[in-house]
């Protein structure tokens, strides 16, 4: 694991900040904002457990690493800020403003570098899942279960997946129906209300909906209940 930030490094960072030289630090300097992000990412990868799920386990692991790394950076910022307040207490308001303005910029840079890393690795995994089919079943009193299918079509946001559902009603369908995520024992996890145009019996229905990736990791089937 990469070296964690120690008290000596924090004090060195404050000293550099005091002279306004942080921007000129080399890339391999422990006080560089890029290094903050790199260390947080390494700490996350060493600390976060893998997620045992064939379809979305890697994406959930990446998201958990992102949250861990964000907290690692946030905790270090909090500690550093407290030491900075003590260090600059005798400086003028103008000097304090300039110092903390630079500190804010470096905070944003560290978070940005970290997010860029996880966005990139997430997108690589998302591409592999586009078009994947989900295990699905439908209400046989309302739909032809042999023609029911669901697949992943896109990832609209971090930890969000877009699903395309195809159903064929066996009787006239109104303008809405329910989709229920269930676990492997068919116990309900979460319902979604889907709106659609009324359909005739035998008329194919296609609906897209967004849902959290975390729910898919627990789901073995999707049930559709007309109403």
Model-predicted segments: where are they?
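C-terminal motif of bacterial Sec signal peptides marking the signal peptidase cleavage site
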Residues: 21-24
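Beta-strand signatures of extracellular beta-sandwich domains
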Residues: 178-182
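Bacterial signal peptide processing site
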Residues: 26-28
